[in-house]
């Protein structure tokens, strides 16, 4: 890849990663859906989105970051994960010099089952989880993006929980509370050799399908089909989701593209495929 030109990440037709229109329109609520496999960890993409939102541009990813926005114009990010502890995100964001007062990290991994699920009905569990997000969002509702990693694990953790309940009582209400909701999901289930027809598997697949349908952009992180390479980690496929973009700018659209990316120790580089 040494002779191949490095590219900037561009997701929308205004040459942005997160359009300013998303935060200027009062009724704008947009869903991003990021899928990855266990071998294509999405932390670098999460970092780029937080950096863009707080600092105005993903300068750690893009070499030409000429259109930086003042951080005061869109300032707050809420991150939550069901598979990683708080330090996983704070350590990474500190390296990018993201001010700690511009984001909150909700830890749903440590003692989550004991504190939030044990001996509680499903409705109470979902309302309590939603309340934690509401508390983190309430001071900056017009400037907040929410990134939630693997909410589909609730389908495994909460006995009897269905995809419809998860969407209607958690995902959809959460989307209404923030300007941009970013769901990050592991798609390994679709790579299982023998099809699993269990109710749990069906719920998971329905969740992925519904998330795609409700999203206006889908970002797929995939490993190389040919296996390992020293100069390429995987591919990023950017495509439109099933929902229209919620904005008054009718000309704004997703720029569908495919990149190769290389994860290095302190950075990630993008190249056109």
From Swiss-Prot:
Keywords linked to the UniProt accession: Cytoplasm, Nucleus, tRNA processing
Pathway: tRNA modification; 5-methoxycarbonylmethyl-2-thiouridine-tRNA biosynthesis
BP terms from Gene Ontology: protein urmylation; regulation of transcription by RNA polymerase II; regulation of translation; tRNA wobble uridine modification
Principal location class: cytoplasm
Subcellular location: Cytoplasm; Nucleus
Gene Ontology molecular function, alphabetical: identical protein binding
Gene Ontology CC terms: cytoplasm; elongator holoenzyme complex; nucleoplasm
Subunit-structure text: Component of the elongator complex which consists of ELP1/IKI3, ELP2, ELP3, ELP4, ELP5/IKI1 and ELP6. The elongator complex is composed of two copies of the Elp123 subcomplex (composed of ELP1/IKI3, ELP2 and ELP3) and two copies of the Elp456 subcomplex (composed of ELP4, ELP5/IKI1 and ELP6). The Elp123 subcomplex forms a two-lobed scaffold, which binds the Elp456 subcomplex asymmetrically. In each lobe, ELP2 is tightly sandwiched between ELP1/IKI3 and ELP3. The Elp123 subcomplex binds tRNA through ELP1/IKI3 and ELP3 and can bind 2 tRNAs simultaneously.
Its biological purpose: Component of the elongator complex which is required for multiple tRNA modifications, including mcm5U (5-methoxycarbonylmethyl uridine), mcm5s2U (5-methoxycarbonylmethyl-2-thiouridine), and ncm5U (5-carbamoylmethyl uridine). The elongator complex catalyzes formation of carboxymethyluridine in the wobble base at position 34 in tRNAs. It functions as a gamma-toxin target (TOT); disruption of the complex confers resistance to Kluyveromyces lactis toxin zymocin (pGKL1 killer toxin). May also be involved in sensitivity to Pichia inositovora toxin.
Family: Belongs to the ELP6 family.
UniProt name for this protein: Elongator complex protein 6
Provenance organism: Saccharomyces cerevisiae (strain ATCC 204508 / S288c)
The organism's taxonomic lineage, starting at the top: Eukaryota, Fungi, Dikarya, Ascomycota, Saccharomycotina
